[in-house]
Regions:
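Residue-level recognition of well-ordered beta-strand positions that form the cores
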Residues: 7, 19, 84-86
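Short, flexible N-terminal segments of the mature chain
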Residues: 14-43
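Acidic, low-complexity intrinsically disordered segments
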Residues: 34-90
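Amphipathic beta-strand/beta-sheet edge segments enriched in Tyr/Trp
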Residues: 4-6, 11-13
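A structural signal for the main folded, soluble domain(s) of proteins
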Residues: 1-3, 22-23, 75
């Protein structure tokens, strides 16, 4: 099973979180990440964040990335959205 944990942070506090699960073995890792991020954005009522080169590098290194104001087209009322892969398919 693939699980992604998404958290919204504001003023140093986590104000909202969710875990998205994906059991579709036909999808590769990248598609699972984008699918989970899409579900997160729907649940949190956010526009999809833009992946900058720095976000991609951070995610490749740590399986975790933060999306701040620069990553969203719309105005956001929090400091950042953090996503982290917490379980991967074997």
């Amino acid at each position: 099973m693939f699980r992604l944990w998404a958290k919204i942070w504001k003023s140093g506090r986590m104000i909202r979180d969710t875990v998205i699960c994906n059991e579709d073995t036909k999808l590769n890792r990248t598609r699972k990440i984008f699918s989970a991020l899409e579900e997160v954005c729907i649940e949190f009522d956010l526009s999809r964040p833009i992946w900058l080169d720095s976000n991609i590098a951070e995610f490749k290194k740590h399986d975790k990335v933060r999306f701040g104001r620069d990553n969203f087209i719309d105005e956001i009322d929090f400091n950042y959205l953090e996503i982290q892969v917490i379980e991967e398919d074997e």
